[in-house]
From Swiss-Prot:
GO terms for molecular function: magnesium ion binding; phosphoenolpyruvate carboxylase activity. It comes from Mycobacterium leprae (strain TN). Its cofactor is Mg(2+). PANTHER family: PHOSPHOENOLPYRUVATE CARBOXYLASE (PTHR30523:SF6). Belongs to the PEPCase type 1 family. Forms oxaloacetate, a four-carbon dicarboxylic acid source for the tricarboxylic acid cycle. It catalyses: oxaloacetate + phosphate = phosphoenolpyruvate + hydrogencarbonate. The keyword Lyase applies. This is Phosphoenolpyruvate carboxylase. Keywords: Carbon dioxide fixation, Lyase, Magnesium. InterPro entries: PEP_COase (IPR021135), PEP_COase_bac/pln-type (IPR022805), PEP_COase_Lys_AS (IPR018129), PEPCASE_His_AS (IPR033129), Pyrv/PenolPyrv_kinase-like_dom (IPR015813).
């Protein structure tokens, strides 16, 4: 019998020491020491010796706890009754250290990458260079590649998150520290203008220390919009055009007779300001603010780049001869100061026309405008054509090199960003659509009780209405606040499409989509606001309708719903009008909350297989949109591995995925890191589309059958926990979920409805609360029991069954990804600290009943991971993360202890502003340190 004894289990709360070469990590540790020393000096100078000595004592004791030299209860006693005015600087010190440690780790990853490249080591998986090498070996023909990459799109979609609330000042300061540490890593002691790097670091860390990390007021959607847009100027404006251009050139060089990637492959998106599901704060004004701010940001970028180009392209007509097209373009500028500088005059014409465009489409006017009274550009394509004229002319007189830098990036940028910057998705819950459509139908006299109709009659009625051009209601209709609000939001979306182009609002996503009528109801609402017309031979539908299948049951039924949608001739004409593309979104968060980690992941995989089959049989092109959170419990984990883990046919040259929370800052705040992450998305998409990456071959069906069984067992185990009497009370008492809702964290309510049901709780607070309390339950619970039961069930021997699972781990990217992501969560969990949170549960019997189940399953899951993978260490396959976890654990320790202490005070009535601020600071500090907490 396979032994699951304590001998192979890590003790709860133990640090799993990793075998990491000290030589490789010494530069990173040196960077951390440097930043930590400067932070300590700043703390002493600003807060005095008493606070410094206390922070240093806490740091030393934290390391002693990790080495098991003292008991955790000793550390807890340090904070019991600690004056809040001393607790706050301790929290701030360790939170700041987490930010600075993140900087050091990011710099070290770059350092190691360059070392490996310089040493001529094999290309790293997830890099485009490695992907091109794999494609070269595959010897694919042009027709296959051209067909597979038709309409290829990789779209990271930025979404709001309550813990990613760093103020712009903190963001900018952290970026400056990163730039300085990069110079330091390159061996410099001074900046380009001769200033001491260490002195500049001290200045920036002092600024950071004297700047509030969090806002006192509740985060507004306008703040979240600004947070999302900051990443464009930080990195994306430059990196996305670079990657798009390089990928297109690389693929066309390999298959020159195929017309590949006619459009940009990387196309960013956003939900911030368009996601209304459970968030009444998203109104028509917010949609206008989101789309208008995005347009302002991109037009301002273009104007600034054109101004730079005017300074750079100073060639004189006395020395070069331009093309007739360039001369014609320049002729519209009569500026005598640059009379013999045709490129400057041409660029001033372009800037003048773009200034007229800004005046036409923007409420707020950006800098660098030029009022020449010229007509505005009606489309981004017109702007691209003028930039092409400049490029073509430069190439005729030996100046192609000058066209290959800023001008090329600007031209490429206009091709992807247009006048809209990023596509803003609309999202709302299907229940809301039903209620509004029922009201519209009743007002129009078409049916007085639509909600009472069975599904087939609903579909018949809605199809008939969609075939009729006239709207259901007019401006004078007396509608409810809900209906007026929903129609106003869509009217604002229609206005954005009119001003900025159809790419401004590309999709409408239906949360909790469970039927064909749920899809058609959205079509009715789009029709009411001028965003859909299916009455004629040429349907108009600039906004695609994307059903979102979220629960495990809905994922199971998704393919049948898609097939029924496509069986409707009217809906099929809408799909044809959109290039035969149909997008379907898959929800990882609610499926996880519904059935647990393993069951949810397998439900998504099975849903993808079925959806791909429907697409193949009906002849449409399927684009899957993955609603992944930052955490493993919400579908997170390394994107490259996650994409390769998709089933055959599921990527199909195109995918979208959400990017959330601290993950956005970790991936896109710096150009080098942003490039690496965007490269990995494109690389995985190309490999999944063009190569056989599943690796199962004829064994696929037997592997699927195993996962069917294990996922069912995992769902049952998870259900036993969440259905334990009193579980909701335990969850609310042993985590900060209540405080997430009551304090100023995010603008969105923590529940979709005003209930205490887990089913109604939003996924982000569910996962965030378990992360803060270091249980990380959504990322692993139920998996250990499921595999243990399956191994014991026969008919093969237990050792044979373990070997079968080990073989799947070796061969199957999906299975390997599931276990690897789970291991990352388990490594960051700490049941010793979780026990401290459990002490907040007043009912001792309830505490023991639930916590003992969690602790037993935690041990069991670590044990089964070891058996299947053969690895003693959870992070044996990810040494970089192993280093990160090991290095930062001692600095997480005091943040968790202080959070428990302050939660106890807050709940006992000590709810003064300082205690609330302390709780908020611990939440943000832990989120920064864990880097993917929600």
């Amino acid at each position: 019998m396979v032994e699951f004894s304590d001998a192979i289990l890590e003790p709860i709360g133990a640090v799993q020491r990793t075998r990491v070469g000290r030589e490789a990590t010494e530069p990173m540790r040196a960077d951390i020491r440097l930043l930590g020393t400067i932070l300590g000096d700043t703390l002493r100078e600003q807060n005095g010796d008493e606070v410094f000595d206390l922070v240093e004592r806490v740091r030393v004791e934290s390391f002693r706890v990790r080495r098991s030299e003292i008991d955790r209860a000793d550390m807890a006693r340090m904070f019991s009754g600690l004056d809040i005015h001393l607790a706050i600087p301790i929290i701030r010190a360790f939170s700041h250290f987490a930010l600075l440690a993140n900087v050091a780790e990011d710099i070290h990853r770059e350092r190691r990458r360059h070392i490996h490249l310089d040493a001529g080591e094999p290309l790293r998986d997830s890099s485009l260079a490695a992907t091109y090498a794999k494609l070269d070996l595959a010897k694919l023909d042009s027709a296959t590649v051209a067909d597979a990459l038709t309409g290829a799109v990789v779209s990271p979609v930025i979404t709001a998150h309550p813990t990613e609330t760093r103020r712009r000042t903190v963001f900018v300061t952290q970026r400056r520290i990163t730039e300085l540490m990069r110079l330091h890593a390159e061996g410099h002691t001074e900046t380009a203008d001769g200033r001491s790097i260490e002195r500049e670091l001290r200045r920036q860390i002092l600024t950071l220390w004297q700047t509030a990390l969090i806002r006192l007021a509740r985060l507004q959607i306008s703040d979240e919009i600004d947070v999302g847009l900051r990443y464009y100027s930080a990195a994306l404006f430059h990196v996305i055009p670079q990657v798009n251009s390089e990928v297109r050139n690389a693929l066309r060089a390999r298959w020159p007779d195929a017309e590949l990637l006619s459009g940009p492959i990387l196309q960013p998106g956003s939900w911030i300001g368009g996601d209304r599901d459970g968030n009444p704060n998203v109104t028509a004004d917010v949609v206008r603010r989101a789309t208008g701010s995005a347009a302002y940001t991109v037009v301002a970028h273009y104007l600034a780049e054109l101004t730079h180009l005017e300074q750079e392209l100073s060639m004189s007509a006395r020395l070069i001869t331009v093309t007739p097209e360039l001369a014609t373009l320049a002729a519209s500028c009569q500026d005598a100061a640059c009379a013999d500088e045709p490129y400057r005059r041409a660029l001033r014409v372009i800037r003048g026309r773009l200034s007229s465009t800004a005046a036409h489409i923007l409420d707020q006017q950006p800098p660098n405008q030029l009022g020449l009274g010229l007509p505005p550009y009606s489309t981004p394509a017109e702007l691209c054509a003028d930039l092409d004229t400049i490029e073509a002319s430069l190439c005729t007189h030996g100046a192609a090199l000058l066209a290959d830098d800023r001008l090329a990036l600007l031209r490429e940028g206009v091709g992807v960003f247009g006048f809209h910057l990023c596509g803003l998705d609309m999202r709302q819950n299907s229940d809301v659509h039903e209620e509004v459509v029922a009201e519209l139908l009743a007002w129009a006299g078409m049916h007085q009780d639509y909600s009472s109709l069975p599904e087939d009659q609903r579909v018949k009625l809605l199809v008939a209405e969609l075939g009729n051009r006239r709207p259901l209601v007019g401006d004078r209709a007396q509608l409810s606040d809900l209906a007026r609000g929903e129609l106003a939001v869509l009217a604002a979306a229609a206005h954005a499409v009119e001003l900025y182009g159809s790419a401004a609002v590309p999709n409408y996503i239906i949360s909790m989509c469970q039927s064909v009528s749920d899809v058609l109801e959205v079509a009715i609402l789009l029709k009411e606001t001028g965003l859909l017309d299916a009455s004629g031979s040429q349907p108009y539908c600039p906004v695609g309708i994307s059903p979102l299948f979220e629960t495990i049951d809905d994922l199971h039924n998704g393919a049948a719903i898609l097939h029924a949608m496509l069986e409707l001739p009217l809906y099929r004409t809408l799909v044809a009008a959109r290039g035969n593309w149909q997008e379907v979104m898959l929800g990882y968060s609610d499926s996880n909350k519904d059935g647990g980690y393993l069951a949810a992941n397998w439900a998504v995989y099975r849903a993808e297989l079925a959806l791909v089959d429907v697409a193949r049989k009906t002849g449409i092109r399927l684009r899957l949109f993955h609603g992944r959170g930052g955490t493993v419990g919400r579908g997170g984990g390394p994107s490259y591995q996650a994409i390769l883990a998709q089933p055959p046919g599921a990527v199909n040259g195109s995918l979208r995925l959400t990017e959330q929370g601290e993950v956005i800052a970790a991936k896109y705040a710096e150009p080098q890191i942003a490039r690496r992450n965007l490269e990995s998305l494109v690389a995985a998409t190309l490999e999944s589309t063009l190569l056989d990456v599943e690796g199962l071959g004829d064994a696929a069906e037997s592997a699927y059958a195993i996962l069917d069984e294990v996922a069912g067992l995992a769902r049952r185990s998870y259900a036993e926990l969440v259905n334990t009497p009193g579980f909701v009370d335990y969850f609310q008492a042993s985590t900060p979920v209540s405080e997430i809702g009551s304090l100023n964290i995010g603008n969105r309510p923590t529940s979709r409805k005003p209930t205490t049901s887990i089913a109604d709780l939003r996924a982000i607070p569910w996962v965030l609360a378990w992360s803060q309390s270091r249980v990380m339950l959504p990322g692993w619970y139920g998996t250990g029991s499921a595999f243990q039961q399956w191994v014991a069930a026969g008919p093969e021997s237990e050792s044979q069954r373990v070997e079968m699972l080990h073989d799947l781990y070796q061969r199957w990217p999906f299975f390997r990804s599931v276990l690897s992501n789970m291991a990352q969560v388990l490594a960051k969990s700490d049941l010793g600290l979780a026990a401290r949170y459990a002490e907040l549960v007043v009912d001792e019997a309830l505490r023991r009943r639930v916590f003992d189940k969690i602790a037993d399953e935690h041990r069991r899951t670590i044990a089964i991971h070891k058996l299947i993978t053969g690895h003693d260490d959870l992070l044996a396959d990810n040494p970089a993360l192993a280093r990160s976890v090991f290095n930062r654990f001692p600095y997480l320790e005091p943040l968790n202890h202080l959070q428990v202490e302050l939660l106890r005070r807050y709940r006992s009535g000590h709810d003064d502003e300082m205690v609330q601020r302390g709780i908020l600071l611990t939440m943000n500090g832990l989120a920064s340190a864990l880097r993917n907490s929600g």
